[in-house]
């Protein structure tokens, strides 16, 4: 039995193309893997704080007494990391906003990037500690950006996730959704076909 974690980061709720693709994937995965468990975490529904001068020290404990905010942040970071460690398949929705990922997803990444916990420094360089997991990234874009210079999202996600040990990454694209109904429908259909194959 596998455990699947779905991380939603779109601010568009039911109007989100990536949320629709995530829900489609969940449906197909449950059909084909009835014994597997699926956990859904909506990063827009829970407030994940942006790091500031106070909170960054919560993730780098020095032995000093922590403030209430720092304690809450460290507890949240521990919870999010434990959730990642406990799951085998990680599905991340990552719509392109202004050529990059949503703020909510960036704040999540800041919570889980912790030296000695999700990565460590060795004499041979940094080593990611979240190994042996499958990552599926669902990304939607209003225009066509795949493999072009405007696609900053894919290389960033590959770099960050590989840094913490998540190297088995597959991207599923829903592109051109702002180019008219026909283009949007075709993009969704193409993404569904890919997701159906992954979930089989």
From Swiss-Prot:
GO molecular function: electron transfer activity; FMN binding; oxidoreductase activity, acting on NAD(P)H as acceptor; oxidoreductase activity, acting on NAD(P)H, quinone or similar compound as acceptor
Cross-referenced SUPFAM superfamilies: Flavoproteins (SSF52218)
Coiled-coil blocks: none
Enzyme class: oxidoreductase
Residues that, per the record, bind FMN: 10, 96-99, 140-143
Cystines in this chain: none
Details of cofactor binding: Binds 1 FMN per subunit.
Signal peptide feature range: none
Domain of life: Bacteria
Alphabetized InterPro entries for the sequence: Flavodoxin_fold, Flavoprotein-like_sf, FMN-dep_NADH:Q_OxRdtase_AzoR1, NADH:quinone_OxRdtase_FMN_depd
EC annotation from Swiss-Prot or TrEMBL: 1.6.5.-, 1.7.1.17
Keywords for this protein: Flavoprotein, FMN, NAD, Oxidoreductase
Catalytic activity from the UniProt record: 2 a quinone + NADH + H(+) = 2 a 1,4-benzosemiquinone + NAD(+); N,N-dimethyl-1,4-phenylenediamine + anthranilate + 2 NAD(+) = 2-(4-dimethylaminophenyl)diazenylbenzoate + 2 NADH + 2 H(+)
Needed co-factor(s): FMN
Gene3D superfamilies: 3.40.50.360
Assembly information from the UniProt record: Homodimer.
Stated role: Quinone reductase that provides resistance to thiol-specific stress caused by electrophilic quinones. Also exhibits azoreductase activity. Catalyzes the reductive cleavage of the azo bond in aromatic azo compounds to the corresponding amines.
Similarity-based family: Belongs to the azoreductase type 1 family.
Protein name: FMN-dependent NADH:quinone oxidoreductase
Gene (UniProt): azoR
């Amino acid at each position: 039995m596998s455990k699947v974690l779905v991380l939603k980061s779109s601010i568009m709720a039911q109007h989100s193309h990536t949320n629709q693709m995530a829900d489609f994937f969940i449906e197909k995965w449950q059909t084909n893997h009835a014994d597997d468990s699926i956990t859904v975490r909506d990063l827009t529904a829970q407030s994940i704080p942006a790091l500031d001068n106070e909170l960054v020290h919560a993730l780098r404990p020095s032995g000093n007494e922590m403030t209430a905010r720092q304690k809450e942040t460290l507890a949240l970071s521990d919870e999010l990391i434990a959730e990642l460690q406990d799951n085998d398949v990680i599905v991340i929705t990552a719509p392109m906003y202004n050529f990059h990922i949503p703020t909510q997803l960036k704040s999540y990444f800041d919570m889980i990037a912790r030296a000695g916990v999700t990565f460590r420094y060795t004499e041979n360089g940094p080593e990611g500690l979240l190994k042996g997991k499958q990552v599926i990234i669902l990304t939607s874009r209003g225009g066509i950006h795949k493999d072009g210079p405007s696609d900053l999202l894919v290389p960033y996600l590959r770099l960050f996730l590989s840094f913490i040990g998540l190297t088995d990454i597959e991207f599923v694209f829903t592109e051109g959704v702002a180019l008219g109904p026909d283009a949007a429908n075709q993009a969704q259909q193409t993404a569904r076909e890919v997701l159906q194959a992954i979930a089989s």
